[in-house]
């Protein structure tokens, strides 16, 4: 289960990183858009594999695309388990 949350955290971090990459967006918008698309698809796949007993707040954050909040939630969960 922790492996799932580690993958989700990585995917969320990647998408947030791409969003924050203003240089890439300005210099190569096509690549920027492709990286956004790829990161979003990865998150969508992970959302579909979300455990049935997932915390309702995490589900809410992911459904609303509250990426920062979802990442904070997942990181807190992993930290609490010593990862």
Q: Where in this protein do the model-derived segments appear?
A:
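Short terminal alpha-helical segments
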Residues: 1-26
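Amphipathic alpha-helical interaction modules
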Residues: 18-53
